[in-house]
Amino acid sequence: MAGYLSESDFVMVEEGFSTRDLLEELTLGASQATTGKVAAFFVADAVVRKHFCFLKYLPRVRPFYAVRCNSSLGVLKVLAELGLGFSCASKAEMELVQHIGVPASKIICANPCKQVAQIKYAAKHGVRLLSFDNEVELAKVVKSHPSAKSWGEVLTLDALGLHHTHRRVGCSLMFQASVIASVAQGYLELVCQPFHIGSGCPDPQAYAQSIADARLVFQMGAELGHTMNILDLGGGFPGLEGAKVRFEEVTSVIGKNIPFYTPPPCHVPLRTHATKKMTSSDFCCRVHVTAKEKPLFSPFLTEQTGAAPKSIVYHLDEGVYGVFNSVLFDNTCPTPALQKKPSADQPLYSSSLWGPAVDGCDCVAEGLWLPQLQVGDWLVFDNMGAYTVDTKSLLGGTQACRVTYAMSRLAWEALQGQLLPAEEDQDAEGVCKPLSCGWEITDSLCVGPVFTPASIM
């Protein structure tokens, strides 16, 4: 192993153990004081499988993980052990990944609008890859970090995407030549051409267009004296089952277009941000009912239906200003699982779930049909791994989410066998070696040089 993980960091569980299994087992054996806290549960096996899947479909691509997605230490350590690089948007994120031992060569300062203090921190601690998308940002980098390797960002017009990153990030193709010329004037080295595709984009062909645009930028750079040797494929990969576009569809488009637009001798190393793909579905979160309001009586609905509807309002210890922020930003509708499965003859009531904020926006979900709950009951929400459990609540006095990390013995042994020792894993700048370090990716399993648990896939 590379040395990021300690067995004591994780609860060791049986193979096939789910986050729900972990939650139920730990809750049954916990005291009331412990179970009354907001808690999240993470089983690392799914991340290990997703990493192998990523290498299978994109063997040339080196994944980077955006720390802002989920900066839980257990997650970062597993990803570091798997060999991922880290995309950091702040000084605090760079400090965090360096604290667990990640070398500066595997860190990108990927915020295109950086504070000067952040640039100086990167310079002091050896982080040389910095992104930019305009001349003003470039001037700041030249002044505060003259040895930096610049990372120019080109936008992709993902008109159908859920999050339109081009509103804030990326330089249009029209202005890219002038930005590249500014790099030359600042005596910086331009080494990479990334592009951004918004999360939730339903059209895989957006990646094809982006790769074609990046090829044009490579040509512009060559004409102005820059030999760009890295192509960053951006992010936006689907991370949940049932997404409109499957991960395999996206990788198929990328796989077909990369050889066409980057043929030998332009066989450039590739990087990407596999953020939501890695963690979205690997956490479940437990919250509690803290208050309950009596069924609401609506004269209007009574007149329309002929019967008084029973709508119960439950208040939870977390809301949309904390772990359920996806309700505001991603238009999700969280659906809880109950502590106990209701019997077939148990009546269901129209119910709504609200967070602790005293305002009309902190509605987690409504229109749910649930059995009658009591104060102190807990509800479980799946798919809480991305921009959720690690989000600091905007409400004063709310508690941090306590995370329990688990891993099967099989996944632990797979991690032990799949990487070189840290001192041998010297990652040279500009060189994109396969993260598998000798692992052969096949259709059904990953065959390691010494040990390979076939069932991990």
From Swiss-Prot:
Keywords for this protein: Cell projection, Cytoplasm, Cytoplasmic vesicle, Golgi apparatus, Membrane, Nucleus, Transport, Ubl conjugation
Annotated gene: Azin2
Organism, scientific name: Rattus norvegicus
Protein name: Antizyme inhibitor 2
UniProt induction comment: Up-regulated in activated mast cells (MC) (at protein level).
Major localization listed first in the record, in broad terms: nucleus
Family: Belongs to the Orn/Lys/Arg decarboxylase class-II family. ODC antizyme inhibitor subfamily.
Superkingdom of this protein's organism: Eukaryota
Post-translational modification: Ubiquitinated, leading to its proteasomal degradation; a process that is reduced in presence of antizymes. May also be degraded through the lysosomal degradative pathway in a proteasomal-independent manner.
Annotated Gene Ontology cellular component terms: axon; cis-Golgi network; cytoplasm; cytoplasmic vesicle; dendrite; endoplasmic reticulum-Golgi intermediate compartment membrane; granular vesicle; mitochondrion
